[in-house]
Curated annotation (Swiss-Prot):
Enzyme's top EC category: oxidoreductase
EC number: 1.1.1.1
Protein name, UniProt field: Alcohol dehydrogenase
Binding site for substrate: S138
One Pfam family, short name: adh_short
Amino acid sequence: MSLTNKNVVFVAGLGGIGLDTSRELVKRNLKNLVILDRIDNPAAIAELKAINPKVTITFYPYDVTVPVAETTKLLKTIFAQVKTIDVLINGAGILDDHQIERTIAVNYTGLVNTTTAILDFWDKRKGGPGGIICNIGSVTGFNAIYQVPVYSGSKAAVVNFTSSLAKLAPITGVTAYTVNPGITRTTLVHKFNSWLDVEPRVAEKLLEHPTQTSQQCAENFVKAIELNKNGAIWKLDLGTLEPITWTQHWDSGI
């Protein structure tokens, strides 16, 4: 899929991986990049505009933990501005297993709620045009970093939820896939808390292993968006992009 003249909404598009991905996206000659983030970063917005002045870049403050009704209200404003949205990227995430409720609220519940809100505009059963959802998971959603089980569990939930969305595409008209970064050198992983402090040095130990840069991750992130494969589970690790084949151990039969 060509991203030329597309309208993209990027939740957490100013974070570590998010900002580098936004830089790559504007190089693709989007029509609009709408960034929703908790913290404003005018310098980053100015930089993105300078990379490609032809792309209209808009920022709205957004906390993914707000009720669905508030997200729906914000999306109504965005749709009024850009008329159509082609791609939604759900990228908000925290890594701190001391904050159990907030980890689940940001990494999973917020993603589900943002998705639920945009379905109000996209669902073909309501006359919507459909759309594409790219959810950011993590390789920990495949195999946990066992010292951070809350974070890992939240990312496993993202993979499962997104796979369900993909299978619902014939009903809703909305396709979905996950991009799942491996350990990427961002502020997220420089220092974080393990669950119940089971491993005080978990961040240091993790960074002793091979990692990738956020730029490497961002380049493959955008490649995955361009490939636009419904139901795909992409692994973005060590500068590579690889589709994951999920092993089915049970079938609901419905």
